[in-house]
């Protein structure tokens, strides 16, 4: 049985600089997954206001949509969702053995495509916010 050794806090803190593209893809995929789970609970809590009537639900939505920070968070949610979807498709292909030798390139392509989609969508989300 192998034993781990204590490298010290300074050495452990600097390990993130040694991450490869595959490790960053894993970290981002886990992070975006947790963000989406958190959003799901927020979404359900907003939808639950409809149980109190249409007026309460509509006033809740109009109140949230009038806040600029909510509009910015929607753009962030779009970025998180698009990256998670694209990286998930990339992982599916890698698991099937397609593109194994180009994993790094496909990860960077998913980042670029996420950026393009989000930048193209910004006017839709921020219209009337400011």
From Swiss-Prot:
Q: Topology with regard to the membrane?
A: Multi-pass membrane protein
Question: Which pathway or pathways does this protein act in?
Answer: Carbohydrate metabolism; tricarboxylic acid cycle
Keyword Transferase listed: no
Residue intervals on the Periplasmic side: 47-71
Protein name, as recorded:
Succinate dehydrogenase hydrophobic membrane anchor subunit
Q: Where in the cell is it found?
A: Cell membrane
What lineage, starting at the top, does this entry show?
A: Archaea, Methanobacteriati, Methanobacteriota, Stenosarchaea group, Halobacteria
Tell me the residue numbers annotated for binding heme: 84
Tell me the organism. Answer: Halobacterium salinarum (strain ATCC 700922 / JCM 11081 / NRC-1)
Which segments does the topology annotation call Cytoplasmic? 1-25, 94-103
Instruction: Recite the UniProt keywords alphabetically.
Output: Cell membrane, Electron transport, Heme, Iron, Membrane, Metal-binding, Transmembrane, Transmembrane helix, Transport, Tricarboxylic acid cycle
- Looking at the UniProt entry, the stretches that span the membrane are 26-46, 72-93, 104-128
Give the protein's biological function.
Membrane-anchoring subunit of succinate dehydrogenase (SDH).
Instruction: Report if keyword RNA-binding is assigned.
Output: no
Q: Which PANTHER family match?
A: SUCCINATE DEHYDROGENASE 2 MEMBRANE SUBUNIT SDHC, SUCCINATE DEHYDROGENASE HYDROPHOBIC MEMBRANE ANCHOR SUBUNIT
């Amino acid at each position: 049985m192998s034993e781990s050794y204590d490298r010290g806090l300074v050495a452990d803190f600097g390990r993130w600089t040694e991450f490869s593209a595959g490790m960053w893809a894993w970290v981002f995929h886990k992070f975006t997954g947790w963000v989406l789970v958190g959003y799901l609970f927020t979404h359900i809590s907003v939808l639950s206001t409809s149980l109190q009537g249409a007026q309460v639900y509509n006033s809740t939505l109009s109140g949230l949509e009038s806040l600029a920070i909510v509009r910015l968070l929607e753009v962030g949610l779009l970025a998180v969702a698009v990256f998670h979807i694209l990286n998930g498709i990339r992982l599916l292909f890698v698991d099937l053995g397609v593109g194994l030798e180009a994993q790094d390139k496909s990860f960077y392509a998913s980042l670029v495509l996420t950026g393009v989609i989000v930048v193209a969508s910004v006017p839709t989300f921020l219209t009337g916010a400011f």
